[in-house]
């Protein structure tokens, strides 16, 4: 159907699997399709996959609707499952030498044996005056990653890229940036993705990576006797509380945020409350903004669930 330039972003969440597929064109990305399928209750416990067969069945359905020829399929590990540390090295080291150095330092960086970790690293910032360079080392349990990859394989899919959700969120905003208000000072914003059960906050593209992925400590609506209006009020209160704490953590790094860019499950009235309580402007945005469209897309208030899948689909690495 399409040339082998189709890139697929697959967001595996505890409530649903969401997929976006795009084609890279000279003038940018073209959206070719998007879809979601709910995940049966009990498939996940928090971020832990406890019923792989149920997830495999959902992924098999997803596989059937995707184009047959793909350039890449990108998934992401949840931010809460990821550990991150920094390491200073000599700037003159080659990439291979940096890898050896990171491997040697793994026992002191993370509280798990090195053989239990899957890790990656990247340079951040410029070389210091004394010839040093900061490496950001990201790691996750190898068992967790292998669980996801095995389920994908069982559904006939293969992940070419395993990313992390904070970077997917940043990338989604990066491709939608042209649709944001011109007067917005992007470097002063924090990115927020609010799902039914989690709050993901990260710094904007182009800045040093900061992120927090927090579960929302509120009752879920399924089988709950609490009135929906009260549940919504409790949820908004919890989101406001956690965002306040995360902004304090961010400011403690020496950076400031004067606004929030939110993709998530928020009504317009909730956005106003959030803005008032935190004393900052809150701006919504659509992950599909900035894409040329070969298919129709949902309105902004319904587009937010596809934010991470969209950010994964527009991955531009090699």
Label each PLM-derived region with a short phrase:
Residues 1-318:
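Hydrophobic/aromatic-enriched cytosolic interaction surfaces used to assemble or bind macromolecules
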């Amino acid at each position: 159907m399409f040339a082998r330039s189709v890139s697929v972003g697959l967001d595996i969440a505890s409530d649903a699997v969401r997929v976006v597929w795009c084609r890279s064109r000279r003038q940018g990305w073209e959206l070719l399709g998007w879809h979601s399928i709910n995940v049966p209750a009990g498939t996940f416990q928090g971020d832990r996959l406890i019923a792989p067969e149920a997830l495999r069945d959902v992924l098999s359905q997803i596989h059937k609707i995707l184009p047959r020829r793909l350039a890449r399929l990108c998934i992401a590990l949840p931010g809460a499952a990821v550990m991150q540390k920094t390491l200073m090295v000599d700037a003159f080291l080659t990439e291979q030498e940096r890898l050896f150095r990171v491997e040697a330092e793994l026992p002191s960086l993370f509280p798990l044996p090195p053989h239990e970790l899957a890790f990656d690293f990247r340079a951040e910032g410029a070389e210091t005056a004394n010839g040093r360079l900061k490496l950001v080392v990201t790691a996750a349990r190898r068992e967790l990653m292998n669980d996801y990859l095995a389920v994908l394989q069982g559904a006939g899919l293969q992940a070419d890229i395993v990313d992390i959700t904070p970077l997917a969120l940043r990338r989604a905003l990066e491709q939608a940036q042209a649709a944001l208000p011109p007067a917005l000072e992007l470097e002063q914003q924090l990115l927020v993705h609010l799902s039914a059960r989690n709050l993901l906050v990260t710094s904007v593209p182009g800045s040093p990576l900061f992120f927090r992925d927090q579960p929302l400590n509120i009752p879920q609506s399924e089988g709950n006797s609490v009135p929906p209006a009260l549940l919504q009020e409790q949820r908004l209160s919890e989101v406001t509380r956690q965002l306040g704490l995360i902004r304090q953590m961010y400011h403690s790094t020496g950076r400031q945020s004067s606004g929030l860019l939110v993709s998530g499950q928020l009504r317009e009235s909730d956005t106003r409350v959030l803005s008032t309580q935190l004393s900052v402007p809150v701006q919504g945005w659509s992950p599909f903004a900035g894409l040329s469209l070969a298919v129709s897309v949902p309105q902004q208030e319904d587009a937010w669930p596809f934010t991470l899948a969209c950010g994964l689909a527009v991955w531009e690495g090699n």
